[in-house]
Amino acid sequence: MMTPIWRKMRPICVSAVVLATLAGCAKDTPYAAPSFGFSNAYSGHKAGAPVLLENTAWWKGFKDPTLDRLVVRALQDNLSLAAAKERITEAEANLQAIPGGVSLDPSLGVQRSKGIGGTPQTRSTATVGLSWLLDPYGARRAQGRAANARIEVADAEADAAQLLMLSNLSTAYIDLRYSQQVLRIRHQEINSRRQTLELTQTLFDKSSATRLDLLRAEARLSEAEAAVPTARSAVLRQQYQIAGLLGVAPGLLDISLDDGPMPRPAMSANVGIPADILRNRPDIRIAERIYYANGAEIDVAPAQLYPQLSLSGAITLASIASGAPGGVRGAEYVFGPSLTLPSLPDGPRRGALAAQESRARQAHTAWQSTVLSAVGQVESAITEYSASAAAAQAAQKTVRLYQEAASLTRDLVLRDSATLADLLDAQESITNAELTLAQNQRQLSLGFINLNVSLGSGHASGRASGQEVAPISN
């Protein structure tokens, strides 16, 4: 036999069961992942096997311990990476900020009163409020899916920040070693032209050279010395940039950046196949997750077009105590559904829905554009890397030939079979050829960096990639 309280509570319980059943019937709009028509291989490159490059430490291909140490330090202390990680924390907090379907609102209160000449009384109350908003259109779940996607966007942005940092740091390091190589070439040029000046002075003293020859030799030496300050300034500038990328003030970096050789890639980049960039490039994952989030937010808008049903109530326990023996205790409760109708006209809300659908289509177009741009960047990087390798090889041969020509010219000058002007020109040709070789070696190294960055290689190296995100409860 039902008690009077249960008899009164039964309609409420039945309503709760019905509401839960209706809420469970809500269906999400199915998500169709965007697709792109990739070729089987990059142009001018043999078809390979799919490869995951997220943890590839491609910079170790330079076999440069100093660069390896700089990368390890930058992964720990780079300020841009720290800011990107905080954006992940913010996105996770935004997910937790989405209100759930059920909320409890407890409260406690104590009130003491005393009338004129009366007995003091203390009234104590404890109330628990309950609110349950029915979500038959899955708006909250859609908000949760969108928030989860925003977390994944923030995570991919952290990967992109790491990739950019690796690119900037490696490029700055290559430029540093290039500037140091240029400085070495300038000092070698000064030594060579000083020797030529001494030879010219000796020949002038023997009346075998003219005053014009002597002036030309002095001018060439002065010209070489004038190029040194600019080269030295370039070295310092790159050292300061590297320190900044490591989050250290200039002059406080404890990793030596003194004179060192120009690093050259000791291995080829693992290119894989074009379809690999969908998972290897953070910017493509960002665009895809933004598209997903915009699609999920479409499911939020329809809820504003229809009535909203909610169940709310409260249970209050009260106690009144006075100086007299005994007291009063009691309980009261109130429960009931409420229906909120949308305001009319509904044109603004339907317009908001149409605008959200348009944003989703825009996001899809942006994804396609990002993929197309990424494929083009990889194709260009492959071509530039191959061209730089060929140019560097040819430049090495050029330097060797000019060195042989300069040595022969010096011998001919001593035998009066060539002029001092010929020797000065030969030495200048060596300097220009060595500068060209250094530039080509720099381009080869930068091409290796650019190719790996274009492939998305190493974006999660040194840390766990991706995050498991718990779905929002309904």
Where do the language-model regions lie?
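Terminal intrinsically disordered/low-complexity segments used for targeting and assembly
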Residues: M2-Q76, N148, R232-R279, A321, ...
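Periplasmic alpha-helical coiled-coil/stalk elements that build and connect Gram-negative outer-membrane
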Residues: T3, R140, A156-I273, E384, ...
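Amphipathic alpha-helical coiled-coil segments and their boundaries
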Residues: D77, A84, L133, R140, ...
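Heptad-repeat amphipathic alpha-helical coiled-coil interaction surface used
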Residues: I88-E90, L95-A97, R112, G144-A146, ...
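Small/polar-residue-enriched beta-strand and adjacent coil segments characteristic
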Residues: K27, A57, K63-T66, L70, ...
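Mid-chain, structured segments of secreted extracytoplasmic proteins
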Residues: V72-L95
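Short histidine
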Residues: T419-T431, G462-E468
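A short glycine-centered flexible hinge/capping loop motif at secondary-structure junctions
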Residues: F204-S208, V413-S417, S454-G458
